[in-house]
Amino acid sequence: MFITFEGMEGSGKSTALNRVQQVLLDAGHGVLLTREPGGSRLGRTLRSILLDLSNDDIVPEAELFLYLADRAQHVGQVIRPALDEGVVVLSDRYADSTVVYQGYGRGLDPERLRELNDMAVGGLWPDLTLVFDLPPEEGLRRAMTRNLREGTSVSEGRFEAEHLAFHARVREGYLTWAALHPARFRVVDATRTPDEVFEDVMRAVRSVLSAPARP
């Protein structure tokens, strides 16, 4: 079972992901928690390039292929082996982030990005993708507060530094992409309390866990 958590910066997806992991572990499931970029050894190097605030001159096409390289390595080295062992894989971001951020956000063709991602991951798409939705102003406020608290404003603050219009396009991109793929996506209202959000998340997770396994 492969479940991905998507959304803007500061949407609360990482917090929910950790809570889901604990519930599944308590229920006896094997669980792998991972993230993009940075879910493999190579990916950690790429993450330091992609998220560093000082790398503000990366052109959209170069950014795209760095993410695709991270993802191909992540799937081949981490995700597929875990799925082959029957482990539930929970990933903080995956291919849909590239479709939305580089497509709707940067202006590249979303459908072409889906095709490139499909090649990078060998056709491996999630069983469930949760999109945590909230206004970009609120998400940025939360994300900047977190980065200041954790001291990552420079090392992981490149997207938080983007102008508000970019984040508005990202939000609309997520909602548009989710509407185009309703069988896999669930949109979660992330403006509510963490407990209310988590109730919705677990409802969706339990639904997909109880469904017949895909071939």
Swiss-Prot record:
Pfam families to which the protein is assigned, alphabetical: Thymidylate_kin
Tell me if Disulfide bond is a UniProt keyword of this record: no
Q: Which reaction does it catalyse?
A: dTMP + ATP = dTDP + ADP
Binding-site residues for ATP, renumbered to this chain:
G7, M8, E9, G10, S11, G12, K13, S14
Q: Which InterPro entries match?
A: P-loop_NTPase (IPR027417), Thymidylate_kin-like_dom (IPR039430), Thymidylate_kin_CS (IPR018095), Thymidylate_kinase (IPR018094)
User: Kinase: is it a keyword of this entry?
Assistant: yes
- Taxonomically, the superkingdom here is Bacteria
- Give an example GO cellular component term for this record: cytosol
Sorted alphabetically, the keyword list is:
ATP-binding, Kinase, Nucleotide biosynthesis, Nucleotide-binding, Transferase
An example Gene Ontology molecular-function term: ATP binding
What EC identifiers does the entry list?
A: 2.7.4.9
Q: Which GO terms describe its biological process?
A: dTDP biosynthetic process; dTTP biosynthetic process; dUDP biosynthetic process
NCBIfam families attached to this UniProt entry: DTMP_kinase (TIGR00041)
What HAMAP family has UniProt attached to this entry?
Thymidylate_kinase
Q: What is the stated purpose of this protein?
A: Phosphorylation of dTMP to form dTDP in both de novo and salvage pathways of dTTP synthesis.
The family assignment reads: Belongs to the thymidylate kinase family.
Task: Kindly provide the name given to this protein in its UniProt entry.
Answer: Thymidylate kinase
- Organism from which the protein derives: Nitratidesulfovibrio vulgaris (strain DSM 19637 / Miyazaki F)
The gene it comes from is: tmk
